[in-house]
UniProtKB/Swiss-Prot annotation:
SMART domains registered for this protein in UniProt: POLIIIAc
E.C. number: 2.7.7.7
Record's catalysed reaction(s): DNA(n) + a 2'-deoxyribonucleoside 5'-triphosphate = DNA(n+1) + diphosphate
GO-annotated molecular function: 3'-5' exonuclease activity; DNA-directed DNA polymerase activity; nucleic acid binding
Localization annotation: Cytoplasm
Keywords of this entry: Cytoplasm, DNA damage, DNA repair, DNA replication, DNA-directed DNA polymerase, Nucleotidyltransferase, Transferase
GO CC terms of this entry: cytoplasm
Sequence similarity: Belongs to the DNA polymerase type-C family. DnaE2 subfamily.
Protein's recorded name: Error-prone DNA polymerase
NCBIfam families, per database record: polc, PRK05672.1
């Protein structure tokens, strides 16, 4: 086998393996076909339809994708192919897509094994049978934990009792057929029960054929040929064997009877089948396949209608709510342009019959607002004037240029996408509201298909092949360190593996085949599917891993193909942070704000942003965004919209970023490729940055319709992978050149479309996010204590650890006040971090004094909120007399006592950590002293030295309010001639420097071609270090494993952006001893 042999139809360019799937099936099929040994289909060979075939959605059983299976079936001349995954219809939509391209008819089915061992396949005959199979799968899956199923004969009998006939049952007799099983199946399904004869070129095939034919005659069942197919081609047996070993958690050498005896469970040529099966069995299979006429693409779906009150239609009620929203959003009346947009959109919604969908989203948002849960719509829905009127989105149509086609189009044969973000800590309340509103029969989350990636695949494969754990780890690290500049073979050899070793070669080949191979189903981050009828009539429903949640077996791409609407209820940590911050500002500072009422266009806020003083704020907190801020210098809200969108693959790949910056800085004249597109490009100085701009350019400059422009944008990534991109480039070029546009501009536009096909922001989405960017920045600038406190209380979220947040708040900046932070103390601390002291805000002229932050007990490692609440409740009743009183009234167990002592949280009661440890150790088994015994005097304990205290702080609280660790190490740094970060400020551009700091962050952007960005911190601040890919590979261990990293390199200062270009790296972590420091890596 070669490397190419191992990858049949695997789309390695697709992020997530399947995105976007609906437009690249043909490409994946071509890839599968390219590697198929073309079977000669001669006259005279029998016709055939395969009735029992597992795809890769029979997890860890099926070795081939639907694309590979249908491509093979097409080449072998099959008339039909049944996808019969085990107790699942999760892969059936992929089968539908592959069927459409190949012309091989899809038969819908599923395989089942009952708890008594009876095995059979159900094949859907017609529209009556499909919901019956869905219902049986649902029953089985809901009766077991996630990933399993449980089904008994009584369940099957109940499902098919007194229903219209619509399925065929195919009995799978097994190695030792038990006639009683077949008789039972025949009792349930009558003449619709068949016996599957499955022969795989084994020694006893002849005898088995006779036994099964006799058994069929005895039971009065028709026998049909069937393949028990687990792979498209014979050579995939090694993959199937490996999956079997993984499934059974055994090395291949110990799998024994778990493995098939040969590779015959593939889609065999019709000539080969004719040499194995009697013609009658092959003809019976074809005849049965012909009776299965069900077309899954024809299933009907109705959105819930109970939100429409009596006397209204969905259309009239949506109109009523929209008009009410207009009066609220625009109390002074709306412009003619907005009215025109709303009327046009309402008409299109009615035409597409999406009213109930909009009403459902509006209802969910209404519930959240009634519960004081912050929420905001985003994505392309922010192009909707109706969504704004309904209160779903926050982008005012008067303030931005909307392009409705980006959200909703008459020609687009797919539902609109409305994403709504909710506070991440309270999103579950919203999900449970949906479940209560519609019931678990009619509401469920969409699935997400978890696929193997290189690292996870090689771990499982190497383990199956018996590689020792240490070698598995080495091999896996090669995959975790991928970049396009160093071939995989080289990385593996550098790790010490011999590619000529047959064992290593096999491991690598199977690993490549398993890349993007489905591993299991998980739940979508928040995509709800809601139906007017039970969902199990449309798609099987199963239990999720989390309690009180259920998921359907289709993912978001399946839903799009099947035209099922989903409501995305997503979780956003920054909304939690902002809500908690606003509550603190209201309660402690006397300022009652919402996101909408925060003072707009605040100059001090923009000054802070321009300095990249944005640790912890929304979106513009990453190192890449921070590097952009001093160059772009946002000075108004629209600049924030651009800032959010500009550091994305679309503008970057289209080479639009630097021209825009040069024009913004006055280094390049603002010009337009044509007066006809000046209005489109004027907001971005003649440079297209947003998806909507590119679409409008295509419409004006290349005579595309709205739908054509959007289809091109959405489909470009799939076309590129399929190799058909040039014809579309040619079409755009010819049309634009015909209107006088320069070739360089045309190429830029096309490259940007390609980038957007991978990942890019529409302007509407960027504007939605910019609202939160501004809100978080305003709060950080004007209420730094409340913001830092709210951010700590919203953890985990964002790029920065609690330690970095606290360091940033205490450090302050020229634009922002410093904040005092007080330690955790059981005498004063609540569970949450709180504000203490300060003076309330009175006016702009009298802003008061910033309060201090008292760290809460949530920061203490190993302490639960339940214990903390007991401490607070007991303290509220009366002050603690001593440690014994605390432990008694708060019912502290040994774990809680130790956690509080280690965290230094008893400072206010007994003093330093050593004293606290001793005091807590003496709490157990205290007995009354004997009469006359002298009282035991407290023992004075010397405080731990500074290094021990800091070490204990990080270990128990994750941060320290004492000296920064680097301050303690500064004398040793000076001996090594290592500079502090503060020393860099006076260094000219291009200077050679040697610095060191704690590693707080590592990032590897997808567009950076292997470059790693590292953030270092010392007692004076942070810097960004750029590590080129060649150095990253050479100093890999120091880069990935260092807690304290020394860097020699070149200091660069350009346009207010400062960073260090690494020339060499050294790990100095041994100087920290056992100190473990938090680092947010590769988020």
């Amino acid at each position: 086998m070669s490397w190419d042999d191992a990858i049949e139809g695997v789309d390695r360019d697709t992020p997530g393996g399947r995105m976007p799937r609906a437009w690249n099936v043909a490409a994946r099929l071509r890839a599968a076909n390219d590697d198929i040994s073309h079977a000669h289909v001669a006259d005279g060979v029998p016709t055939y339809a395969e009735l029992h075939c597992l795809s890769d959605f029979s997890f860890l059983r099926g070795a081939s994708s639907a694309e590979q299976l249908f491509a093979r079936a097409q080449h072998c001349g099959y008339s039909a192919l049944a996808i019969t995954d085990e107790c699942s219809l999760a892969g059936i939509v992929r089968g539908l897509e592959a069927s459409r391209v190949t012309g091989v008819r899809l038969i819908v089915g599923s395989e089942f094994t009952l708890i008594d061992g009876t095995r059979f396949v159900l094949l859907v005959e017609n529209a009556h049978g499909y919901p019956q199979v869905c219902g049986l799968v649902t029953t089985a899956r809901r009766a077991a934990s996630k990933g399993a199923y449980r089904l008994g004969r009584a369940d099957v009998e109940a499902q098919f009792r007194d229903v219209a006939p619509g399925v065929f049952a195919l009995w799978l007799p097994g190695v030792q057929p038990q006639a009683e099983q077949g008789a039972w199946l025949q009792q349930v399904f009558g003449e619709r029960a068949f016996l599957a004869v499955e022969l795989h070129r084994e020694q006893d095939d002849g005898a088995r054929l006779q036994v099964l034919q006799a058994l069929a005659q005895q039971l009065g069942m028709t026998a049909v040929a069937s393949g028990d197919v687990h792979m498209a081609q014979r050579r995939e047996r090694i993959v199937q064997d490996t999956l079997t070993a993984i499934r059974h958690t055994l090395p291949l050498a110990e799998c024994g009877a778990h493995l098939f005896r040969n590779g015959e469970r593939h889609l065999r040529t019709r000539r080969a089948l004719g040499n194995i099966y009697p013609d009658a069995l092959l003809q019976a299979a074809v005849a049965l396949a012909q009776r299965c006429t069900f077309d899954i693409s024809k299933i009907s779906y109705t959105y819930p209608r109970e939100l429409v009150p009596e006397g209204h239609t969905p259309t009239s009620y949506l109109r009523q709510l929209t008009e009410a929203g207009i009066r609220k959003r625009w109390p002074g009346g709306i412009t003619a342009k907005v009215r025109e947009d709303i009327e046009k959109e309402l008409a299109l919604i009615a035409l597409k019959k999406y009213e109930a969908f909009f009403l459902t989203v509006q209802d969910v948002v209404r519930f959240a607002r009634e519960q004081n849960i912050l929420c905001q719509g985003r994505g392309s829905s922010a192009n909707s004037a109706v969504c704004y009127a309904l209160g779903i989105t926050a982008v005012n149509p008067d303030e931005t240029r909307l392009l409705m086609a980006r959200f909703l189009s008459e020609k687009r044969d797919e539902p609109p996408d409305i994403d709504v973000d909710f506070e991440h800590e309270r999103r579950e309340e919203v999900l449970q509201y949906v479940y209560r509103k519609y019931g678990r029969e009619r509401a469920a989350l969409a699935a997400t298909v978890i696929c193997y990636r290189g690292k996870s695949a090689v771990r499982d494969v190497a383990k199956a092949f018996g590689l020792p754990p240490d070698q598995i780890a080495l091999l896996a690290n090669c995959y975790g360190w991928g970049n396009g500049e160093t071939p995989m073979e080289q990385r593996i050899e550098e790790a010490g593996f011999d590619l000529a070793n047959p064992l290593i070669n096999k491991i690598l080949l199977v690993t490549e085949h398993l890349r993007d191979h489905p591993r299991h189903l998980s739940q979508h981050v928040g995509g709800f599917v809601i139906s007017d009828e039970p969902l199990s009539l449309l798609v099987p429903v199963e239990n999720a891993a989390m309690a009180d949640r259920t998921i359907i077996q289709w993912d978001k791409d399946d839903l799009e193909t099947m035209k099922l609407l989903k409501v995305d209820c997503l979780a956003l940590g920054m909304l939690t942070c902002i809500r908690k911050t606003l509550d603190l500002v209201r309660g402690h500072r006397g300022r009652d704000y919402s996101i909408a009422t925060l003072p707009g266009e605040d100059l001090p806020t923009y000054k802070m942003i321009q300095r990249a003083d944005t640790v912890g704020v929304f979106q513009i907190e990453s190192r890449a965004q921070m590097a952009m801020l001093p160059r772009l210098k946002p000075a108004e809200f629209y600049d924030l919209v651009i800032e959010v969108a500009i550091v994305r693959p679309g503008p970057i790949q289209g080479d639009m970023v630097h021209p825009y910056l040069r024009r913004r800085q006055g280094r390049e004249d603002v010009s337009y490729p044509s007066p006809a597109v000046e209005d489109i490009l004027k907001p971005t100085l003649g440079v297209p940055l947003f998806q909507e701009q590119v679409m409008e350019l295509l419409m004006h400059a290349a005579d595309y319709t709205e739908s054509e422009a959007d289809n091109l944008r959405r489909s470009m990534a799939a076309w590129r992978r399929g190799g058909d991109m040039e014809q579309h480039r040619t079409r755009v070029r010819e049309r634009m050149q015909g209107k006088g546009y320069a070739s360089t501009f045309i190429d830029q536009i096309f490259e940007q479309i390609k980038g957007f096909g991978s990942y890019g922001f529409p302007q509407s989405h960027a504007a939605s996010f910019a609202k939160l960017v501004y809100a978080s920045c305003w709060l950080k600038r004007h209420e730094p204590a409340a913001f830092a406190c709210g951010l700590l209380n919203a953890q985990p979220m964002g790029f920065y650890s609690a330690s970095q947040i606290v360091q940033d708040a205490r450090r302050g900046s020229p634009e922002r006040e410093r904040v005092e932070v007080l330690p955790v103390d059981v005498v004063h601390s609540d569970w949450d971090n709180t504000l203490v002291g300060g003076r309330p805000w009175r006016s702009a002229a009298d802003p008061g004094e910033q309060p201090a932050i008292r760290l809460g007990m949530r920061q203490v490692a190993g302490l639960s909120d339940v214990v903390a609440q007991r401490i607070v409740a007991a303290r509220t009743q009366r002050a603690f007399a001593d440690i014994g009183d605390l432990c008694l009234r708060a019912a502290l167990d040994e774990k809680a006592r130790l956690a509080l002592a280690e965290a230094g949280a008893l400072q206010g009661m007994v003093g330093n950590r050593n004293a606290a440890r001793w005091a807590m150790a003496g709490v157990e088994a205290r007995r009354p002293l004997l009469p006359g015994s002298p009282e035991e005097r407290p023992v004075a304990f010397e405080a731990p030295h500074a290094g021990e205290e800091i070490l204990a702080d990080y270990r128990s609280v994750g941060l320290s309010l004492r000296q920064h660790p680097m301050a303690l190490l500064r004398p040793q740094m000076r001996q090594r001639r290592i500079l502090g970060l503060r020393d860099l400020q006076g260094r000219p551009h291009g200077s050679g420097v040697h610095v060191a700091g704690l590693v707080t962050q590592r990032q590897r952007p997808a567009t950076a071609k292997g470059t790693i960005f590292v953030t270092l911190e010392d007692e004076h601040g942070m810097i960004n270090v750029i590590v080129w890919s060649h150095l990253a590979l050479r100093r890999r261990r120091a880069l990935l494993e260092s807690r304290l990293l020394a860097v020699r390199g070149r200091w660069e200062r350009v346009d207010g952006v400062e960073h260090l270009i690494a020339g060499d790296l050294h790990d100095l972590s041994d100087l920290l001893g056992d100190m473990q420091l938090p680092s947010r890596d590769f988020h």
